């Protein structure tokens, strides 16, 4: 808008991956026919994994802005880059944070997506190496409207800290229902919970103190 880049005019094209791997693959194939030079996106690891080979084989540079799965940069794709830390790095930070907060018995909950499961596994390994007991490791099903069952299982494990590695819609609902059941255990999330909608779903009181 202000004259382009290096004296070249830049045209911006958009596609919506819908947060779905199949849709992302179709969108990547459409963009690959448009003579583009670079793509910024996508956000989720499973979404990126469905599209990165298409862009690489077409000679298109891809810069992912929120895809943290380790394997995305272990494939040797010369045109793939990202601007976020990998799951192994986030796992180290999560462990350091949990130790700093003094937790001794940690529950880890993920949602079976590439991102969430990868971060959960890295965090579990780091916590065990740091001699922090992991008393619960399981997954919920994304998109459900009631997580009382998994919260009951979590509570039965008697953790003093819960690390949820999934996304903000589920995190918000977990926080709300945790408060409704009168359970005050501290909760922490990964980078995918960084969205104002989490507070809207949980309610300000339930979101208070969430890490």
Descriptions of predicted regions:
Residues 1-12, 128-132:
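Signal peptide-proximal N-terminal region
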Residues 11, 104-107, 160-161:
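Residues that mark the start of a beta-strand
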């Amino acid at each position: 808008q202000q004259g382009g880049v290096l004296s070249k005019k830049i045209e911006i094209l958009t596609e919506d991956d819908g947060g779905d791997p199949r849709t992302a693959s179709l969108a990547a194939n459409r963009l690959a026919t448009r003579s583009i030079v670079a793509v910024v996106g996508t956000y989720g690891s499973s979404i990126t994994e469905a599209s990165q080979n298409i862009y690489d084989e077409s000679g298109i540079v891809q810069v992912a802005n929120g895809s943290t799965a380790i394997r995305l940069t272990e494939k040797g794709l010369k045109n793939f880059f990202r601007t976020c830390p990998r799951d192994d790095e986030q796992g180290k930070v999560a462990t350091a944070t949990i130790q700093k907060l003094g937790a001794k018995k940690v529950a880890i909950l993920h949602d079976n997506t590439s991102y969430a499961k990868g971060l959960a596994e890295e965090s579990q390994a780091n916590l065990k190496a740091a001699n922090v007991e992991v008393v619960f490791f399981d997954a919920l099903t994304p998109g459900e409207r009631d997580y009382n069952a998994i919260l009951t299982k979590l509570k039965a494990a008697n953790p003093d800290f819960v690390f949820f590695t999934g996304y903000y819609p589920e995190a918000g609902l977990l926080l709300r229902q945790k408060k409704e059941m009168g359970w005050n255990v501290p909760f922490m999330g990964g980078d995918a919970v960084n969205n104002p909608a989490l507070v809207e779903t949980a309610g300000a009181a339930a979101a208070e103190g969430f890490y």
